[in-house]
Amino acid sequence: MRKERLIAPILAVIAVAWMVAQLLSSVLFERSLRQALEDLEARGEWRVSRTESRQGWLTSQGSLLLSPLLGRPWRLELSYHARHGVLSTDVEGTLLPRLDSALQKAVGEVSAPSIPRWQGRYHTLSGHSELRLALAPFVIQQNGRELDVRGARMRLEGMFGDWRTRVLLDQLTLTDGLAQLTLGPVVLESRYTYIEDAYHFAQRDHLHIEHIALHYPAYDVQVTPIDIHSHMVLDESELRLKGKLIIGEVRVPSEAPETPLLGGRIEAELSRLNGDAVRQTIRRLRQEAAWGDRSLPMAEGLLARLETDLLKVLSDSPRLDVTAVVIDSPLLGLSVDADGALFFDARRLDELSVLGLEKPEERARWLERIDGDFIWHDAPTVAALWLGLPLGTRELQFDVIRGVWRVNGRPMPVLWP
């Protein structure tokens, strides 16, 4: 009898615990979603807004609107429906791209069998989230041109401070009359780590394109494969961007079916971009977006208002280090092994104008701020011949002095009209 009397209190405790867990799951999901949207907006690249939100114990639903911070050529309307559980929340929804009238006219008709749907899961205890999206094949047609995309998939996972993205594309084909460009499979892997408000952040990206084929009636060009690596870091003092391009083989089968045209790699790093100025520019962009009309592009005169901040980004004398240019051309019998650096003179920045770069005189003033040097090691004889140097010259020293190029102490000859 005593045990029977305990059943009701135990069931009541279990029911209360379940209700509390459900409520906690709903609250934590909402907090995680809000934090993720704030983190996305803190990057300074996106405008994010919630057009609808209904939170409940068992389910929540809503819709989001994402668009580029600069301009409004397109936007993404994302809806979600969340089913809360004690340990996790399952989420699903739709993803609908919208184009502005000008871009819609330029793109033309889009043929897709259904609205893209996505699925995801939020783990209540760890705060880890994952999202999966698979696009049905679609075709865009305009004035005889056609873009055919097949096998597009995306996976996004992570938690506050650390997000990973993986995008897969089986094949993309662009047809314009008798010309055709085909590429794929394509894999993009990205990792983004940051602290609150993206004061410091780092992002690594790796794009791998297994095969590219360009077909013209007269000839074909094939590239296999291409890898692009990038690493961007914003720390206390500076923004650094490092990149590497690796090209496997470029072939022209109609001209030389057995011999590659070229292959190689290029590595470079841009550094000394003032960190505080970068953060201030991002804040100003977010302010401009907040003040403007969500349906319209950025207000006129934006570049003029940002000019001071943009010039401050250059205040630490940025430098571009080209650490490796290694290119080999079996078909032409040429090889390049070069490295060097360029430096920007940041003194008297108030004498420069970003707005005036469209004028030749202003562009000349900017070029005068650039100095640097490059060395082409073990250069072929034909390169010395092109540059008007003695045929026995094996090392080419390129100097940039106030924007003017010299080679081995001589003025750079005019290589083309």
Residue ranges and their predicted role:
Residues 5-12, 16-417:
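Glycine-rich, small/hydroxylated-residue low-complexity segments
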